[in-house]
Amino acid sequence: TSPQREATCTSEVSGCPKIYNPVCGTDGITYSNECVLCSENKKRQTPVLIQKSGPC
């Protein structure tokens, strides 16, 4: 298993790309791509890390 890492935010002004490249967050939720996870983290106080690439 790879170590947990933070989601890398791209400066997508128009939102996240509609590319399905799932990542599994440390909250046990599968996000459709790293950008989506990053966007969700901006709304949280405690960021969710990427547990692994691929669905949970």
Curated annotation (Swiss-Prot):
Necessary for sperm binding (site feature) positions: Y20, N21
Keywords: Disulfide bond, Protease inhibitor, Secreted, Serine protease inhibitor
Record localization: Secreted
Name of protein: Serine protease inhibitor Kazal-type 1
Primary location group: secreted
Function field: Serine protease inhibitor which exhibits anti-trypsin activity. In the pancreas, protects against trypsin-catalyzed premature activation of zymogens.
Positions of the record's site feature: Reactive bond for trypsin: K18, I19
Pfam families hit by this protein: Kazal_1 (PF00050)
S-S pairs: C9-C38, C16-C35, C24-C56
InterPro entries: Kazal_dom (IPR002350), Kazal_dom_sf (IPR036058), Prot_inh_Kazal-m (IPR001239)
The Kazal-like domain, residue ranges: 3-56
Encoding gene per record: SPINK1
